[in-house]
Curated annotation (Swiss-Prot):
Lineage: Viruses, Monodnaviria, Trapavirae, Saleviricota, Huolimaviricetes
Tree of life domain: Viruses
Biased composition regions of type Low complexity, renumbered to the chain: 255-270
Protein name per its UniProtKB record: Uncharacterized protein 7
Acidic residues biased stretches: 238-251
Disordered: annotated span: 235-270
Amino acid sequence: MTQLEGPENPDRIGALILFARRWSLEIIGLLLIGIAGMLFLELQPTIPRFWQVSFLAAVFASPIAYYTGSTVVRWLYDPKWLYLIDLSAAEEKGSLYRLPESQFRDLEVLDGQLDRLAPGLYVGKRVDLENNRVAGTWRGTLSDRDLLLSLRKVRECRGQLEEDARQGFILRSSAYTVVRRAVRDTTMQVVKTFERGSLPDSGEAMNNAIHSELEEFGITDNLEETIEDLAEEKLADSDLEADSDDSESFEFVENPEPSENGSEPTIKND
């Protein structure tokens, strides 16, 4: 536990007034008890008349003096307040506490020590007034130049980390495609290697044999071009057959006989 340091140069006059205000009734009560004990024991000390009059005047004037003094103290005297800032870097919000000196001295600092910014102003974190506990803080000792350099390095590292995170996101989103493409390329490379190992001429002899076989049947063009030529020839033959059928089906005669055109007269003239 770290002991808290109170404010420097306490106000002695204010402390004396506060003490008299807090213990005045107790002092008067003790004096009355002492006088009653002396009378009970029949002790008759010789007290000068001056002190007797002064004591009686003080006793009768004490209520008025107490009321007047308390009012004046309440108007004029302001007790010493200490301010404690609850600051934490992990949270955006903070708090400001105003504590009397007695309560401030009773606080228990759990870790480190409180940072004093100014007379009567302290900084801590995790303030718990119910248990009178507070955690200390640490103030950096870097100069302005070193602090600027450190912030510059932090900014550079942040940019690099953002770039790495962006690349990681791209790789994660396209991992399936990358793996599939790599497996396919590897498989094709294995197939090509197998073909080169099993066929010494890389299959050129087989291609030459196929071309020579096609040339024997008079097929020298490309297969697609051959199919197109066959389709055009088939279409031309079908057009010629359709034209020949139309010419044989019809014969135009200027005056055909009824029997020739398939019609017979219904009435015969003798």
